[in-house]
Swiss-Prot record:
One of its GO terms (molecular function) is ubiquitin-like ligase-substrate adaptor activity. Its main location: cytoplasm. Pfam families: Beta-prop_DCAF12 (PF23760). The gene is DCAF12. Pathway: Protein modification; protein ubiquitination. Component of the DCX(DCAF12) E3 ubiquitin ligase complex, at least composed of CUL4 (CUL4A or CUL4B), DDB1, DCAF12 and RBX1. Keywords: Cytoplasm, Cytoskeleton, Nucleus, Repeat, Ubl conjugation pathway, WD repeat. This is DDB1- and CUL4-associated factor 12. Substrate-recognition component of a DCX (DDB1-CUL4-X-box) E3 ubiquitin-protein ligase complex of the DesCEND (destruction via C-end degrons) pathway, which recognizes a C-degron located at the extreme C terminus of target proteins, leading to their ubiquitination and degradation. The C-degron recognized by the DesCEND pathway is usually a motif of less than ten residues and can be present in full-length proteins, truncated proteins or proteolytically cleaved forms. It comes from Bos taurus. The lineage of its organism: Eukaryota, Metazoa, Chordata, Craniata, Vertebrata. It is found in: Cytoplasm; Cytoplasm, Cytoskeleton, Microtubule organizing center, Centrosome; Nucleus. WD repeats lie at residues 138-178, 182-220, 250-289, 338-375. PROSITE patterns: WD_REPEATS_1, WD_REPEATS_2, WD_REPEATS_REGION.
């Protein structure tokens, strides 16, 4: 009987959807889902293109903001100091970056100079005199303020007479004019409220509004073309207003610091009697309000944070954050933990407030987290152990101190004097921090300047 032939060919696996095997998990996925999707038709509308570009720019801007914020958060712990030697100059009170490598500074000894942060070269700038120079009798006050206008074409600072306002042209630092008929005491602070108008705050309790007109600028150019000797105009104040003195000691109503809110066209002012004053600035100065500060000793510095719509006010041991539109009891204050030495300078960069103290410290307050940045734990062998929760603190270097008669008679038994941070400023990239000052006691003569990067 013949044996039945058997085929040795393997059966092909059943296709999904063909019979009961279609439900097997091994074959349960649908190939049709993985077919190439048809792309939408390209829209050639100009409006569509512009809207797409706008969204893309918004995303790039948002990413850039996040990146800048992250850098501002991480930078302070990475900064390293490089000191500059300023010779025998006495106490740097004011500073501003002119460009990526030059910083202009003003001192207690009434010297205006530019330091090149790459070469350390110091260049002194001639200071401008009143039309009657013989009337200058005050000594030991110096240049307390330096400010650049929004377009960075003009610089305002103090003159040879500390009561007068001096204007220079940038980037050449050629003299433009002097406002010499306004204040009866030293100028402590300056704020530009437009490209051609600046406000000065004085120790006599007044605020002066000055305008650098096109006529003044044109005459300045013409005079420079004719004469090689610097020639400049003399201008008169556009307005002169006294801060309120009704409820305080009139002798202590000194305008110490100014800060401008460009969005609302409002100018904040701090006086040494512990008050904050707000002014409207539209071709003149109109008072809006005055409020008592929660910490009213040694209110010597003020800054405005545009993104946060708050003023930061420094006092003897605290930084207070003030929104003029909120009730005074809503003012938040933070303690620097360096009692007695005073907050000497304050600034905003992104969400970080940098605080310079009389003890030579730089502290960094995170306004979003509402706390000071803390030290990162160091695992390096031989390094000083850092306590958990300890504030991140940078300390200024030794600087220079004159061992004169005052030092020998009163301070020679003290080994080291910290250099108060009277001024600090970030460059446009936010990666370099210029810091300057000098010894805190008024009788001591010395200086400090350094680049932290």
């Amino acid at each position: 009987m013949a044996r039945k032939a058997v085929s040795r060919k393997r059966k092909a696996p059943a296709l999904p959807g063909a019979g009961s095997d279609a439900q097997d998990p091994q074959f349960g996925w649908d190939h049709s889902l993985h077919k190439r999707k048809r792309l939408p038709p390209v829209k050639r509308s100009l409006v569509y293109y512009l809207k797409n570009r706008e969204v893309r720019l918004q995303n790039e801007t948002s990413y850039s903001r996040v990146l800048h914020g992250y850098a501002a958060q991480q930078l302070p712990s990475l900064l390293k100091e490089r000191e500059f030697h300023l010779g025998t100059l006495n106490k740097v009170f004011a500073s501003q970056w002119l460009n990526h490598r030059q910083v202009v500074c003003g001192t207690k000894c009434n010297t205006l100079f530019v330091v090149d942060v790459q070469t350390s070269q110091i260049t002194k700038i001639p200071i401008l005199k009143d039309r009657e120079p013989g009337c200058v009798t005050q000594q030991g006050c110096g240049i307390h303020a330096i400010e650049l206008n929004p377009s960075r074409t003009l610089l305002a600072t103090g003159g040879d007479n500390p009561n007068s306002l001096a204007i220079y042209r940038l980037p050449t630092l050629d003299p433009v004019c002097v406002g010499d008929d306004g204040h009866k005491d030293w100028i402590f602070s300056i704020a530009w409220i437009s490209d051609t108008m600046a406000v000065s705050g004085s120790r006599d309790g007044s605020m002066g509004l000055w305008e650098v007109t096109d006529d003044v600028l044109t005459k300045s150019d013409a005079r420079h073309n004719v004469s090689r000797v610097p020639v400049y105009s003399h201008i008169t104040h556009k307005a002169l207003k006294d801060i309120p003195k009704e409820d305080t000691n009139p002798d202590n109503c000194k305008v110490r610091a100014l800060a401008f809110n460009n969005k609302n066209k409002e100018l904040g002012a701090v006086s040494l009697d512990g008050y904050f004053h707000l002014w409207k600035t539209e071709n003149t100065l109109s008072k809006l309000l005055s409020t008592k500060l929660p910490y009213c000793r040694e209110n010597v510095c003020l800054a405005y944070g545009n993104e946060w719509s708050v003023y930061a006010v420094g006092s003897q041991a605290h930084v207070s954050f003030l929104d003029p539109r909120q009730p005074s009891y809503n003012v938040k204050s933070v303690c620097s933990r360096e009692r007695g030495s005073g907050i000497r300078s304050v600034s905003f960069y992104e969400h970080i407030i940098t605080v310079g103290t009389g003890q030579g410290s730089l502290l960094f307050y995170d306004i979003r987290a509402q706390r000071f940045l803390e030290e990162k734990l160091s695992a390096c062998y031989g390094s000083k152990p850092k306590l958990a929760g300890e504030n991140l603190k940078l300390t200024t270097g030794k600087g220079w101190l004159n061992h004169d008669e005052t030092w020998r008679n009163y301070f020679s038994d003290i080994d080291f004097f910290p250099n108060a941070v009277y001024t600090h400023c970030y460059d446009s990239s936010g990666t370099k921090l210029f810091v300057a000052g000098g010894p805190l006691p008024s009788g001591l003569h010395g200086n400090y300047a350094g680049l932290w990067s």
